[in-house]
Amino acid sequence: MDTIELTLTIPPVEHAPFLAELEEPATGFVQNDTELRAYVPAERWAAVDQKQLKARLAADGHPDALSIRPLESKNWNAVWEDTLSPVRAGPFLVCPTSVAPPSARDDATVLRIDPEMSFGTGHHATTRLALRLLAEALAPGDRVLDVGTGTGVLAIAACRIGADAARGVDTNPDAVRNARENVRRNEETDCVTVQEGSVDVASDTQYDLVAANITRRVLLELMPALVARLAPGASLLLSGLLRPQRDDIRDAVASHGLALDAEAAEEGWWAGRFARSPSP
């Protein structure tokens, strides 16, 4: 048993408190009009309070809304093929390889992404928000760092719209392998480099845009290192955050001398892009 899938059959308007409760143990979520799915690694399962989840669901009128099942690594492709379809995010269309390519009449930049055990498909609001804010900020020739790259979707997207080079880093070796496969699928091996590790493995240079779509706790822990990787005038893009966490994150980033430049919200989630002063 590698991962546990929790399915909460509740409408989107009721997702927020459960997202907050499962934010730390879960490594990813899938939301749609009828349910919320959370994916928790087996080693984090002890942090999930099933009794509290069931009590809260019952209090909200959903006593039978929770189902739990273990997932083996080999089952993930079937899981995603059953649930994924092309998703538009800003100028991008994120499309799994199990789905036929879109019509040539669509002017979107197509990203062919298969997630396997990683997250970052465009089916979660945090990825869509990050893709939109990235597209608005990226300039041709930029150097991009994607921390917690997952599927590699942000690094790949950056190269597809003009970045000179993008580096994705992730502490999960399965994510690193998956991201490298997606880089090959999108024919971006000359532009995207994927490495195992955290932001420290990218300490040899500075970047024009640093992106991190991870949890609030990890973002706060990594904040000094993320800011240190920014070139003068660069942008810091943070996603993976619930709306109530906005002010805490904004204040933490401001303490490093960066100002909120743009923000977006969707389905209870928030993302912000911060600008570093052009002067050292």
UniProtKB/Swiss-Prot annotation:
SUPFAM superfamilies: S-adenosyl-L-methionine-dependent methyltransferases (SSF53335). Keywords: Cytoplasm, Methyltransferase, S-adenosyl-L-methionine, Transferase. S-adenosyl-L-methionine binds at T127, G148, D170, N213. GO terms for molecular function: protein-lysine N-methyltransferase activity. Its EC number is 2.1.1.-. It is found in: Cytoplasm. InterPro entries: Ribosomal_L11_MeTrfase_PrmA (IPR050078), Ribosomal_PrmA_MeTrfase (IPR004498), SAM-dependent_MTases_sf (IPR029063). One of its GO terms (cellular component) is cytoplasm. It is an enzyme of class 2 (transferase). One of its GO terms (biological process) is methylation. It catalyses: L-lysyl-[protein] + 3 S-adenosyl-L-methionine = N(6),N(6),N(6)-trimethyl-L-lysyl-[protein] + 3 S-adenosyl-L-homocysteine + 3 H(+). Belongs to the methyltransferase superfamily. PrmA family. Methylates ribosomal protein L11. This is Ribosomal protein L11 methyltransferase. The gene is prmA.
